[in-house]
Amino acid sequence: MEKSVNVIGAGLAGSEATWQLVKRGIKVDLYEMRPVKQTPAHHTDKFAELVCTNSLRANGLTNAVGVIKEEMRILDSIIIESADKASVPAGGALAVDRHEFSGYITEKVKNHPLVTVHTEEVTSIPDGPTIIATGPLTSPALAEEIKQLTGEDYLYFYDAAAPIIEKDSIDMDKVYLKSRYDKGEAAYLNCPMSEEEFKTFYEALVTAETAALKEFEKEVFFEGCMPIEVMAKRGIKTMLFGPLKPVGLEDPKTGKRPYAVLQLRQDDAAGTLYNMVGFQTHLKWGEQKRVFGLIPGLENAEIVRYGVMHRNTFINSPTVLEPTYQLKTRDDLFFAGQMTGVEGYVESAASGLAAGINAANFVQEKETIVFPAESAIGSLAHYITSASKKSFQPMNVNFGLFPELPSKIRAKQERNEKLAERALDAIKKVAEQV
């Protein structure tokens, strides 16, 4: 019997997954509801439409997103192939002519003899091997079906996330490790502020520029957590009873309680990333760097994921997904793209690539592959399936997700080059297997 896989959604992840399947001789039934039913963000009927920016971000190997793109080139990604063909001048970044980019992918995928395209909305998950790659604007009917399948609590609609910072960039001389009232182990890094420092920060925060909301995001703006800048505008002391509450956080150096304290919580298993507790925000990214850099200890903080606020639909991957992108409770069902909690065009396509390869292996009765954590593709799969279940939020690829090198290298560029070299060596070994 001919082996086949259903792929739901022809965005970046679904198109890439489809390509990886047909490359391996697997027939694909590809379902895409556009243009019969449009989303509020899409404008065309093309596959892999870029709805926001036309940039696929940095191209160099001293940047994690450059590394993941190179890994995808090694694994014959159609998304990166198309991006390279449709590229436009953008300094050290890979930016594309968005029409040429999605046009090329649509033509290659649609016209492949093993692909059957179904232009219809899918409202229930089909039987048999299936990849769900329906993105952050998944239609309500299918979202409800996924919710039933993954468990009531495991489909999140979120509208806020706090920034995540690289631990190495925090000034450890200015912060201290402590949990409130010394309960349990000392689990938080604490950034103490004097009254003067707090007032300087407060003034900068309430006058900072926020990012514009897209029309389709407005309805969900205030359904979730309150942005820190909105809280601050309610009064100068509001934050002191909220995220900056100093009680129980006396500074061990002075024995005194600071005027205000920002807590940083470990965000990954390796302890290389920390998030700003309660600091979900909609400030522009440049403003986040400027304003949050006024907090003692964060003057030179490297923000690996900026605080964001927009509508999104994603499953609680640490609870429900394997690092192979398979559902724990149904091994012939794979998820890919932003729905898994990867953030960004390239990351979505990379997850589609991994899910496509693994779905092909599954139907051919071969072993599915857990991509090595040393690779960018593997580090992302590892993060989304092993992060904190309670506070899971979407993540871009970044070097903070990679396992540390055996010996510490202080120079950032040299360290990143070594991480990149190790990642590409790991992915070349995967390429030999698949």
UniProtKB/Swiss-Prot annotation:
Protein name: Methylenetetrahydrofolate--tRNA-(uracil-5-)-methyltransferase TrmFO
Keywords in alphabetical order: Cytoplasm, FAD, Flavoprotein, Methyltransferase, NAD, NADP, Transferase, tRNA processing
Name of the gene encoding the protein in the UniProt record: trmFO
Family per record: Belongs to the MnmG family. TrmFO subfamily.
SUPFAM superfamilies linked to this entry: FAD/NAD(P)-binding domain
Listed Gene3D superfamilies: FAD/NAD(P)-binding domain
Record-level GO BP terms: tRNA methylation; tRNA wobble uridine modification
Reaction(s) catalysed by this chain's protein: uridine(54) in tRNA + (6R)-5,10-methylene-5,6,7,8-tetrahydrofolate + NADH + H(+) = 5-methyluridine(54) in tRNA + (6S)-5,6,7,8-tetrahydrofolate + NAD(+); uridine(54) in tRNA + (6R)-5,10-methylene-5,6,7,8-tetrahydrofolate + NADPH + H(+) = 5-methyluridine(54) in tRNA + (6S)-5,6,7,8-tetrahydrofolate + NADP(+)
GO cellular component, one term: cytosol
Lineage: Bacteria, Bacillati, Bacillota, Bacilli, Bacillales
The protein's Enzyme Commission number: 2.1.1.74
